[in-house]
Amino acid sequence: MVSQCQIRVVRSGGSKLDYRRSVFSADGKYLICVSGDFIKVYSTSTEECIHALQGHRKLVTGIELNPKNHLQLYSCSLDGTIKLWDFTDGILIKTFLIGCKFLSLYTSATDDLVFAVTLKNNDSASSQLVSVKLPKSASQECEAKEISVIIEDVSHLPKCTAIGRQCLYVASVKGVHLSIYYFKTKKSFRFSLKATSKKGANNIFTVVACHPSEDCIATGHMDGRIRLWRNFNHKKEYTYTSLHWHHDSVMDLAFSAQGTKLLSGGVESVLVQWPYGSEEKKEFLPRLGAAIEHISVSPHGTLYCTSHTDNKISIIDTSLKVSGIIQGLLKGTVVKTGLIVDPRSNALVLNGKPGHLQFYSLLNDRHLYNLDIVQQEFIHQAGLQYMDLVKASFSSTGRWLATVEELQGGEDSMDLEMQMKLWEYQDKSQSFVLNTTINRPHEDHITSLCFRDEGNSEKEAPTLVTTGKDGLFKVWMLNNNYDIYKQSSSWLCDFVGGYHKNQATNCCFSEDGSLLAVSFDEIITVWESSTWDLKQTFCQPPGKIRNLCFGRMSCSKYLVASTNNGFICCWNLLTCALEWRAQLDATVLQPDPLSENIAVVSCSKRWSNLFLFQPSEPRPFYTQKNICQEKVQWAVFVPKEIPEFVKSESHQWLNKSQLYFLTEKQDLLTFSSKSTEERLTPLSKQLAVEESLPVTPFHLLLGKKRQEEQEKLDAQSVRAAPSFHRGYQNSAIREVLHTPAHVLPPASVLCTVFVNSLLISKKSQSTEESKEDEEMKSEHSEADSSDETEEMESQKRFPSAFSLDVAAMLPKFQEKELRRIRRTDYSWISSL
């Protein structure tokens, strides 16, 4: 029976960090950026995500600091709201309901006004600049109805509008026009440039920035020029100076906090710093990795940050040195490798920069590293062909990685330039090292590749199978006796197979690795992996095989396949008969490696639907429709580090693995049965006590040993001074030492409690000590006067300080034995 449960589709991260300009906190400790419908707060010193502010229902389009409170942040969204946040604690303070779609946001320090670019009548073709009066209300939600139009026709890009010094004017560019509006006088000025010139100039505006303390406006243009405008409060007496270094369009401009420097960036991946007033002495920060999309400056002027088209943010100090990098999930044009999981790190692996594989942590929503596969310099220029990564696969243990790279644009098989590389993971270097390079492994494009499960047997050589459009599948095995010294290994072709010269499209191994299934157009062939003999063929209904997989665990006797004409078929390998067939157009067929479950995603009427089933049963045990409004391209099950145990039967398929899927717009989504509060715990709650601070990698290495040593020292200190140790752990002392000073009561109030907590209680004596004291008292009472006289004489012969030291150093039982020895009569010795 299909279950209906509250499993929601949630964004797993990977949203664009370069969608809007980032914002520094007033002290420069935090960097705030837009990430889809989230707002993320990062630490500039550690690059760790401190908070993920969630409250908007749609894409966040603008963020700005509250000029009247530097600990608060304004944000706007396409959901028609403006929200006020306390970003240091991750708390939503207030929501202003406006009802129009916002594209960007600007704040004013003079009045309770914010400026925003909105769509005219929700029409995406035109936009306007408006001012919104934010009402003062005690309620958490309130409506803002006072909206005034300032400029009718503006660009929808936030970088094309800027607020002037002291909020005296606003400048906006669109096309070849520069518009300036003064708020107090309500006068507007409009300047125009010719679109082109005889020298080949392209004067279309791309960005505008205003000087923080002078009447100067900087504009960037398509031809790479920068113009500095002055005297723009006169229509005929205005002037501008031109700066030119960029060979392509200027993508962003920003003045420093004091206005002494102008920063510019473009597709050259170079940050240019122009000294204001002496622009010929410009400085450069090259090789930033990707085109610069946005530039931000901290309020105190000590930090810059650049947002790049590869979804990366670089934090830069004033000496033009990169001090930190925040890398998000890199989104390319097409994800050809699909979604892969690294068995070692449990990281998501897919196409990254051209010719690279990116490893991405799904747990922390953070980029780990890039693996350069092609190992060629990438030149950003239109029309150039370059080697592109098209296929990748890991072995079951993660020791081996196979990649296939092809020359971009090479469609003709005769001119095809292709390489397959085998990479081995080295424990010493903790990285993949190239082991074998195979030029042109097939005569045509490779369609799929997969490793055989290595299992626990070390005798079996690692095996890789590739299929190609040349109608062949090839078996590659690791040869450990490659050289005469038998000290190196390499991959060699061990077997070549085919079926009636049909194109080989898919391949997969059974769970135990004994069988190999290869699809040739509309036919599936099953081969024995020990001898590579053809054992069985299965014919599908008319339609080419799109996906192919074996069942796992209790369903390992089944083989499941989907076709491009809308069928899913399941065969029983024991009877070699069709077990069942269902009519469903499956774009994705993904098995769970830790269970018998198989996920199917189909697309109908622009909506994608999810079905989960087991091969032994044709009816799905879970269905969720309308998971997204786009076509799902790839999906993958990622094993959970800590399995969950949920009683609900409808949630049990999420116990061991998490299903992630990638849409056409490259949004990474997943399924969760937890609420938003459970998934996103504010870091302020996690850091409420000292023990819950996140550990560092250094602490993971040495923390256990130090913890054991500390426990030993604590045990010794408890035996030496139990009362003081208990006093230090007293809540009164902890309150004084750990409570922030600005919230503590006066010292006179805490003095009595604090001093009393340090006193040694008489009741702290143990029962054994009290018994020993009673025995000592009884022995003292039984001692005669002669013994007391001898003790007094012995005390006179030895200094009192020495006796105190001895008494203090001796334990109770030794002191008791010493007193008995002193009472012994040794007078008989004198008679000898």
From Swiss-Prot:
InterPro entries: WD40/YVTN_repeat-like_dom_sf, WD40_repeat_CS, WD40_repeat_dom_sf, WD40_rpt, WDR75. GO terms for cellular component: nucleolus; small-subunit processome. Residues 764-798 are annotated as: Disordered. Disulfide bonds: none annotated. WD repeats lie at residues 4-43, 47-86, 90-131, 145-184, 193-230, 236-275, 278-317, 323-361, 375-424, 431-477, 490-528, 532-572, 577-614. It is found in: Nucleus, Nucleolus. GO terms for biological process: positive regulation of rRNA processing; positive regulation of transcription by RNA polymerase I; ribosomal small subunit biogenesis; rRNA processing. It holds the Pfam family Beta-prop_WDR75_2nd. GO terms for molecular function: RNA binding. Its main location: nucleus. Keywords: Nucleus, Repeat, Ribosome biogenesis, rRNA processing, Transcription, Transcription regulation, WD repeat. Ribosome biogenesis factor. Part of the small subunit (SSU) processome, first precursor of the small eukaryotic ribosomal subunit. During the assembly of the SSU processome in the nucleolus, many ribosome biogenesis factors, an RNA chaperone and ribosomal proteins associate with the nascent pre-rRNA and work in concert to generate RNA folding, modifications, rearrangements and cleavage as well as targeted degradation of pre-ribosomal RNA by the RNA exosome. Involved in nucleolar processing of pre-18S ribosomal RNA. Required for optimal pre-ribosomal RNA transcription by RNA polymerase I. Component of the proposed t-UTP subcomplex of the ribosomal small subunit (SSU) processome. SSU processome is composed of more than 70 proteins and the RNA chaperone small nucleolar RNA (snoRNA) U3. This is WD repeat-containing protein 75. It comes from Xenopus laevis.
